[in-house]
Amino acid sequence: MALILASSSKIRSALLTAAGVTFAIQTAEVDETAIKEKWQAEKRDNSQLALTLAEAKAQAVADHYPDDLVLGCDSTVMTEEGALLSKPVSRQDAADHLRLLAGKSHILTSAVAIIEKGKTVFRHHDSATLTMRDFSDSFLSHYLDQEWPEIGYCVGGYRLEGLGIQLFEAIQGDHFTIMGLPLLPLLAYLRKASIVEA
């Protein structure tokens, strides 16, 4: 039985590789916008959305790999006002997201779900609170010059493993959760499932 990562995220792949996990990659084709719109129309708890998206991604790939473990992942960013942000689609969109978050705290939730033989056998989510500083327009322009288009793949428009760390004045939460993968609970499950050595 193989482990398949249903994500094209470079950072998630790098985190798993660094932890010694062997896996294949198969990108999930999921209409995230439709799921988010339905979620908001039903006024469901935004803190659970990342878990729903992670399961949807895992299921989309598991349909094609019924004999393997499929790992789906997702992260969401929710503003203090309860608005959900999506991945920025343009440099201007990224600038707008970052200006919206500047000087405030937001909640980043990362989730994982594993599907085996059509059933969810593991699911976990964790949240972190990140507080952005008030930054200047010149810093924002410099940041976008350095980080766009790579941050277009990041729901908050930032990557803490690079220049994005300078956007923040405070961070509360697990490092791996902030990177997009609640790694320690995931590794505990993978050991239990004999995917990695115990």
From Swiss-Prot:
Classification via Pfam families: Maf (PF02545)
Organism: Zymomonas mobilis subsp. mobilis (strain ATCC 31821 / ZM4 / CP4)
GO CC list: cytoplasm
Keyword match Hydrolase: yes
HAMAP family linked: Maf
Cofactor(s) the record lists: a divalent metal cation
Purpose: Nucleoside triphosphate pyrophosphatase. May have a dual role in cell division arrest and in preventing the incorporation of modified nucleotides into cellular nucleic acids.
GO biological process: nucleotide metabolic process
Family: Belongs to the Maf family.
Protein name: Nucleoside triphosphate pyrophosphatase
Coiled-coil spans in chain: none
Active site, renumbered: 74 (proton acceptor)
Annotated TM spans: none
Molecular functions (GO terms): nucleoside triphosphate diphosphatase activity
Keywords from the UniProt entry: Cytoplasm, Hydrolase, Nucleotide metabolism
EC numbers: 3.6.1.9
Localisation per UniProt entry: Cytoplasm
Source superkingdom: Bacteria
InterPro entries assigned to the protein according to its UniProt record, in alphabetical order: ITPase-like_fam, Maf-like
Catalytic activity, as annotated: a ribonucleoside 5'-triphosphate + H2O = a ribonucleoside 5'-phosphate + diphosphate + H(+); a 2'-deoxyribonucleoside 5'-triphosphate + H2O = a 2'-deoxyribonucleoside 5'-phosphate + diphosphate + H(+)
